[in-house]
A protein has these predicted regions:
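C-terminal substrate-binding/catalytic lobe of Rossmann-fold NAD(P)-dependent dehydrogenases
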Residues: 1-213, 217-218
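C-terminal amphipathic alpha-helical interaction region
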Residues: 198-199, 203-267
Length: 267
């Protein structure tokens, strides 16, 4: 969104990520992202990242994570969206053919304040990061219960702080959350992390809304936000899904006003 909506060049993005790495987003991946934007191709003099073909390969760890999550019923939409994003990127020939055919808004049509959007993206990235880790740690907790692993989630976060590509300053906050409450069901329920998310919600929503309005795909941001909104919903429209399942397949349903399992004739 920084590149497409604001038209930022590689050297500008490098400066932004370098600055972000000095604060709460301090992490290995932010650090190397800044370095990637700085690298100039020796032959052409252009930013090397602009010459890299936009087809992301994968070794399978993301796919395995998604598969395992489905097996134990753990919702990890942000991780799933990352896997799907790579798969969609691999459809390069199809995307090139679709680009002039499928209509969409002008992606360079952002008319708001440039610096405000940059700051909003920074806040949205941090909030999305909390949401993504909440999903991942929740999955580990559910796997620990399912397979009797007896995992210490705070210790796992501490281990990740060194010698791992996801090492980040933020992991200290995860460890602290589990020190405060070892049986924490979800990181979003931690008082400090929950406050951090709520403070960044306006910026987070603004970024997703802006991206959607400009036709810029931001699956990580949007999946993370949808997870947050779903998790905080006392009631979801899944009652309609279950009613449909009972209608076409007699899969039964539970009621809100009494115990038991029921099947109805819907016609």
């Amino acid at each position: 969104i920084l590149q497409r909506a604001l038209g930022l060049k590689a050297h500008e993005l490098a400066a932004i990520f370098t600055e972000w790495n000095q604060g709460e987003l301090d992490s290995y991946l932010i650090e190397i992202t800044a370095k990637i934007f700085q690298r100039i191709d020796d032959e052409t003099g252009q930013p090397l990242v602009n010459l890299v073909l936009d087809k992301a390969a994968q070794k399978g760890t993301g796919k395995w994570t998604s598969q395992d999550a489905f097996d134990i019923g753990a919702p990890i939409p942000t991780i799933n969206s990352a896997v799907v994003g790579r798969i969609v990127s691999s459809l390069k020939t199809e995307r090139v053919a679709a680009a002039p055919i499928l209509p969409g808004p002008d992606r360079s049509g952002y008319e708001g304040d440039r610096n405000q959007l940059i700051e909003a993206v920074r806040q949205a990235l941090y909030a999305s990061k909390i949401s993504a880790y909440a999903q991942g740690m929740s999955m580990l907790r559910m796997a620990s219960d399912e397979y009797d692993y007896d995992l210490n989630l705070g210790e796992i976060a501490a281990i990740w702080r060194a010698g791992c590509i996801i090492r980040a300053r933020f992991l200290n906050r995860i460890t602290d959350a589990y020190v405060r409450k070892p049986d924490l069901a979800n990181l979003l329920l931690d008082e400090e992390l929950g406050k951090a998310v709520s403070e960044r919600l306006p910026a987070w929503r603004h970024v997703v809304q802006t991206a959607v309005g400009l036709g810029i795909p931001v699956p990580g941001f949007s999946a993370s936000l949808a997870y947050y909104d779903s998790y905080r919903s006392e009631r979801l429209p899944a009652n309609l899904i279950q009613a449909q399942r009972d209608f076409f397949g007699a899969h039964t349903y539970e009621r809100t006003d009494r115990d038991g399992v029921y099947h109805s004739s819907w016609e």
